[in-house]
Amino acid sequence: MSGGYALLDVGDGARLERFGDRIVERPHPAATGRRRNSDAWAAADLRWDRERGWLGTSPAQLPWSIPLDDLTLELRPTIAGQVGLFPEHAAMLPWLRERVGAVMARHGDEAADSGEAGDAGDAVSDPPVILNLFAATGLATLSLAVIGATVVHVDASRPTVAWARRNAERSGLADASVRWIVDDAPAFADREVRRGRRYGGILLDPPSYGHGPRSGAWRIDLDLAPLLVTCARLLEPDGFVLLTAHTEAFAADRLADELAAAIGRPGSRIETGPLRVATADGRRLELGAFARWSGAAS
């Protein structure tokens, strides 16, 4: 991740991060050990306290924006202690772009082989459609839109989808090929199966618990497995899945088991690992886990 974000210090149950020109302190149970930079902690602009909420920057100074690679993102403190960016997801973006690029290239080759070509002899093929469930404020959606993918962005929160659309506008992607959908992820995926839709890739970042606009409560321990089965029915044969989670009980091995059971393809190779960020001196803060699968050779 370049420019806009840095993990400055961790310790005593808290993390200190720089988002653009703002320094933010937030608690996290994995932030063990002792703090090393007392001056940096004293300079925090915003502090999240579980009892009192946000302390620091006045409302007149909000929101603010940061540059992140090809994007410009709007940040603001939320009642859940977030700011609109999950920096640990940035490490997934190179793999995502590589997978989408590979799918686009294969689609182009298939179009050329079938004789579909443009005036200059270039292959003509629709870009792959990527489904992003629990898509939040749009980091992954916009990172893929930049390289020409068509993305279906689904989140159950109308204000969060509006936030993602503002990020698209700030990033010069207001006219990108993105469908913005306010809906429950399971309900939307079920309807897409009935419609016969297929996707070149599917991203999921499910919360531990949640409530959507249509169905009842979401519980990851009960609802993830059937949703993954539905997603497997939506995948093109050479598609991919990226599953991330921040739930303590869903470490990388469990995510891999859930994904393997849903995909059900012999010989499937699933890569796993932690979602984490690191300080400049190499101390790591683990914030979740991922499992990813691709139906085509890397």
Segments from the language model and where they lie:
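Mobile active-site "lid"/loop adjacent to the S-adenosyl-L-methionine
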Residues: 157-160, 182-185, 199-230
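Non-catalytic substrate-recognition/targeting regions of SAM-dependent transferases
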Residues: 2-87, 94
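Helix-to-beta-strand junctions that scaffold the AdoMet/dcAdoMet cofactor pocket
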Residues: 235-236
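S-adenosyl-L-methionine
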Residues: 157-201
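Conserved SAM-binding loop of SAM-dependent methyltransferases across substrates and taxa
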Residues: 137-149
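Conserved class I S-adenosyl-L-methionine
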Residues: 126-134
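Conserved SAM-binding motif I beta-strand of class I
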Residues: 150-155
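C-terminal catalytic and target-recognition region of SAM-dependent MTase-like enzymes
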Residues: 240-298
